[in-house]
UniProtKB/Swiss-Prot annotation:
HAMAP family found in the cross-reference section: Trp_synth_alpha
PANTHER family: TRYPTOPHAN SYNTHASE ALPHA CHAIN, CHLOROPLASTIC (PTHR43406:SF1), TRYPTOPHAN SYNTHASE, ALPHA CHAIN (PTHR43406)
Name of this protein: Tryptophan synthase alpha chain
Catalytic activity: (1S,2R)-1-C-(indol-3-yl)glycerol 3-phosphate + L-serine = D-glyceraldehyde 3-phosphate + L-tryptophan + H2O
Pfam families: Trp_syntA
Pathway assignment: Amino-acid biosynthesis; L-tryptophan biosynthesis; L-tryptophan from chorismate: step 5/5
Record-level Gene Ontology MF annotations: tryptophan synthase activity
Top-level taxon: Archaea
Keywords: Amino-acid biosynthesis, Aromatic amino acid biosynthesis, Lyase, Tryptophan biosynthesis
């Protein structure tokens, strides 16, 4: 991940596992990383768009093993890094080591457990290190300097910068606070920093990359397309159009930085 990249997020099993695989292959053309969300019944960090996607997947009988199967299929055709996003409860229920081994065998490059604070993640980090599984932690605009530094050090893939306070979901534009946060993280962090929450168009990607981000994480905007078009050819066309627009925005932002 040398040039800035698009990190594309999808909810696994929304609306069904076969569709997820098709969506992953479509987004792969423009994505440097794919983030695959494991549906959960109480996704506290997610806004209504992703919550609704979780409900759609779960109501269709989604099981975690299906995420691993989809990823195994994807791995037959692509080496693009895949990060699995989940909450702590499903990991704990399966057993941390069991979950990490299953994810590794399926072809995952890293994990982000949204509601697992760094100070409670010692065992999890040790298990990930043992099985060569990457880790991603989160930081918010109000994260103090020392925590930002330790979160960066604990994140082997990239540090996930939350662009603003609150939950996921598309928004119109970004405040100066977000740009200041990226600059602060750029100064403090030695690893890669990717920005998520609220990014839905090329101009967003351009402005965030221009400020120094290594990647933009886009979820709700893709999930909205899936909500509206379901498992259809039109969904694939719309997903590719948006991914292309975001990718071009990233390129423009990177050019402005030079």
């Amino acid at each position: 991940m040398n040039k800035p990249v698009l990190v594309s997020f999808l909810v696994s099993g929304d609306p069904n596992p076969d569709a997820t695989l098709k969506f992953m292959k479509t987004l792969d053309k423009y994505s440097g990383v794919i983030e695959l969300g494991i549906p959960f019944s109480d996704p506290v960090a997610d806004g209504p768009t992703i919550q609704a996607a979780d409900v759609r997947a779960l109501s269709n009988g989604f099981k975690i093993a299906k995420s691993f199967e989809v990823l195994k299929e994807f791995r037959k055709e692509s080496n693009t890094p895949v990060i699995l996003m989940t909450y702590y409860n499903p990991v704990y229920k399966r057993g941390i080591e069991n979950f990490v081994i299953s994810a590794k065998e399926a072809g995952a490059n890293g994990l982000v457990i949204v509601d697992l604070p760094l100070q409670e993640a010692t065992e999890y980090r040790e298990i990930c290190k043992k099985h060569e599984m990457g880790t991603v932690f989160l930081a918010a605009p109000n994260t103090p300097e020392d925590r930002l530094k330790t979160s960066d050090e604990a994140s082997t893939e990239f540090l996930y910068l939350i662009s603003t306070f609150g939950i996921t979901g598309a928004r119109e534009s970004f405040e100066q606070m977000t740009f200041d946060f990226i600059k602060r993280a750029r100064t403090t962090c030695k690893g890669k920093i990717c920005v998520g929450f609220g990014i839905s168009k090329g101009s967003h990607a351009e402005s965030l990359i221009e400020q120094g981000a290594d990647g933009v994480i886009v979820g709700s905007a893709f999930v909205d397309i899936i909500k509206n078009y379901g498992d259809s050819e039109e969904a694939l066309v719309k997903l590719e159009e948006l991914a292309k627009e975001l990718s071009e925005g990233i390129e423009k932002g990177y050019e402005k930085r030079k």
